[in-house]
């Protein structure tokens, strides 16, 4: 798929599971990994050289990762970390789509506000038999996505009968 611009990467963030208040760190970790991949895309002789479509990036996450991708999209548009203006961000990647699978919501709230997003495709998936995130929390994030431009965007939520938190 890489020859067509598709690369799937799983960023193992399980080490963050024993921490609290870590979702902002998860978002930075994802953005840093995107930067590595895009660097490989530009690196002469790298197997990924010229293979990635840097203009069409989608990010996906499950559970806390499902919340994290919304935070990553938010941070992607910032020049500084919202909790400390002395920490510079230099991301600004062309993230076009977010896929949130059974996400948590509001574990990270910049300046004590829910994460609000603009102008991004958003797919929310949640299982009706989820016993971990039991109340379709992702709908709260879904409601905090707005569109300001005339571009074509898709925002949809699917509540899937028979699916639980980890097996779809």
Language model region names:
Residues 17-20, 68, 106-111, 132-135, ...:
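Extracytoplasmic/secreted cell-surface and envelope-processing proteins
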Residues 115-168:
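Active-site-adjacent alpha-helix of alpha/beta-hydrolase-fold enzymes
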């Amino acid at each position: 798929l890489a020859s067509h611009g598709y690369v799937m990467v799983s960023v193992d963030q399980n080490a963050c599971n024993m921490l609290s208040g870590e979702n902002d760190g998860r978002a930075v970790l994802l953005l840093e990994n995107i930067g590595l991949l895009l660097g490989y895309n530009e690196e002469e002789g790298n197997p990924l050289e010229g293979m990635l479509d840097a203009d069409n990036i989608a990010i996906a996450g499950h559970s806390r990762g499902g919340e994290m991708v919304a935070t990553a999209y938010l941070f992607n548009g910032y020049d500084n970390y919202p909790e400390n203006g002395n920490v510079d961000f230099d991301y600004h990647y062309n993230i076009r789509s977010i896929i949130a699978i059974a996400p948590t919501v509001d574990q990270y709230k910049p300046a004590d506000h829910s994460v609000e997003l603009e102008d991004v495709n958003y797919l929310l998936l949640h299982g009706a038999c989820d016993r971990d995130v039991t109340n379709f929390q992702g709908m709260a994030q879904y409601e905090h996505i707005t569109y300001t431009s005339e571009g074509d965007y898709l925002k949809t939520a699917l509540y899937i009968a028979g699916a639980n938190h980890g097996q779809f």
